[in-house]
């Protein structure tokens, strides 16, 4: 019984995320669809692609919420290239600015950071050839986390 409720929650949250983000930018619909296409094909390469697409969605979301530039200025006034982790920092910074409740923001911060780090680590290992196969469980867990976190963030920013 509980599994069915969680499954219904996931599906309704997923629909909410897709429709809301698609209304902001149609590219989200394509990116989120690509995750499903890669996820359900089941091959090791496609599971890795699903993780890469999760990363793209998070970066795209960061650009929509808090646009980042190609260059950042460090504390000494020098221009630096923005790294991909800047996307994560922009999401977290925007969350802290938007929400008054410290505990809920810290939980979201932990969730977003954990998902980002997991996707980065799995991608890095795959690129180095250390571990070429992402398991289905790892991929499904990351996708589930993505939709839950995006749903929470959308509700916060609306």
Where are these regions (language model features)?
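Internal, Lys/Arg-enriched amphipathic helical interaction segments that engage polyanionic partners
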Residues: 1-31, 37-38
């Amino acid at each position: 019984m509980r599994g069915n409720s969680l499954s219904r929650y996931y599906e309704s949250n997923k629909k909410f995320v897709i429709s809301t983000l698609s209304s902001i930018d149609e590219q989200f619909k394509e990116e989120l669809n690509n995750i499903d296409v890669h996820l359900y094909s089941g091959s090791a390469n496609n599971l890795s692609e699903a993780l890469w697409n999760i990363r793209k969605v998070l970066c795209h979301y960061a650009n929509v919420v808090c646009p980042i530039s190609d260059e950042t200025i460090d504390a000494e006034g020098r221009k630096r290239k923005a790294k991909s982790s800047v996307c994560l920092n922009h999401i977290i910074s925007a969350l802290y600015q938007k929400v008054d409740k410290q505990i809920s923001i810290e939980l979201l911060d932990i969730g977003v950071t954990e998902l980002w780090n997991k996707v980065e680590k799995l991608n890095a290992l795959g690129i180095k050839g250390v571990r070429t196969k992402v398991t289905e469980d790892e991929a499904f867990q990351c996708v589930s986390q993505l939709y839950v976190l995006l749903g929470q963030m959308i509700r916060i920013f609306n």
